[in-house]
Amino acid sequence: MIAGYSILTLLVVALAGVGAGFVGYAVGASSLISYPALLALGVPPVIANASNTVGVLGTGFGGVLGARKELHGKHLRAAIYVTIGVVGGILGALLLLGLDPKVFEFVVPPLIALSSAAIALNPRGRAEAKQAAADAQAQAARLELEGSRQAVANPTKQRNQHPLVHTQTEPLSEDPWWVWLGVSCCAVYSGYFGAGAGTLVLAVLDAAGIGPFHQVNALKTLIGWGANMSASVVFIVRGVVDWPLAIAMCVGCFAGSYIAPPITRKVPARIMRIAAVIAGIALTID
């Protein structure tokens, strides 16, 4: 027993974290897997949410480490987005702790339903489709320029360079005002509850045409990471974190997000998206 929990229970939480980290990397919905797992153990909603916020930090760490190439040269935008995430996370966490717990229990089902709907509408899939079209067009232009013989002689090089053929992220000065409003609201939402927040941020950035998919996804990860870090600090200071569960979840989330990239190249993201939507629907009904 560790702080009242059996080793088996903590292993189950860690395994749920692996799934949450994996799904979080694939569709930005870690909490739709991890939060229900904590509720299933009988953890009160507010404590479950606080512990979950600390736990899914593992997903953020893994995602940020894996997105270093995508964030290269985007330091100013990355710093601003992390700052927005940090401020929004603090506001969301204080909002959660300042309101009556019954308010949280009342609004959770609609929030989960909204998150599930956002995933079902698949903004990431649309971004991937647009990115694939842009890649194909750029690939054709390059092949025409270099000649078909060079393309055939260096197929491995072509494949390795393929992910890097993208347009650049738009300058900050060209961002519409509603992008900043949307990102800020998503950051507050991430600190308050956060399930599906990554998908909502992705939807905002995708709609604004901020940049190619791989860069948008990296920026989305930064916003959520910043919000979760600051919200976690608030929850820790207030003493509402169940540490054994949070640590087990964090370890699992890191592992899941770390192994996700090579696997998601082979498994359709639609499968993970469907799993997240089903989890969200089940929790909403419950």
Predicted feature residues:
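Small-residue-rich segments of transmembrane alpha-helices in multi-pass membrane proteins
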Residues: 40, 45, 84-90, 115, ...
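Hydrophobic, aromatic-rich alpha-helical transmembrane segments
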Residues: 2-6, 10, 14, 49, ...
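Selected transmembrane alpha-helices and immediately adjacent juxtamembrane segments
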Residues: 1-44, 132-217
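Residue-level recognition of specific faces of alpha-helices
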Residues: 37, 47-53, 204, 215-218, ...
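Membrane-interface alpha-helices at helix entry/exit sites of multi-pass transporters
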Residues: 43-52, 75-80, 210-221
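Transmembrane helix exit motif
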Residues: 61-72, 110-151, 155-168, 282-286
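Hydrophobic/aromatic residues within the transmembrane alpha-helices of Major Facilitator Superfamily
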Residues: 18, 22-26, 61, 117, ...
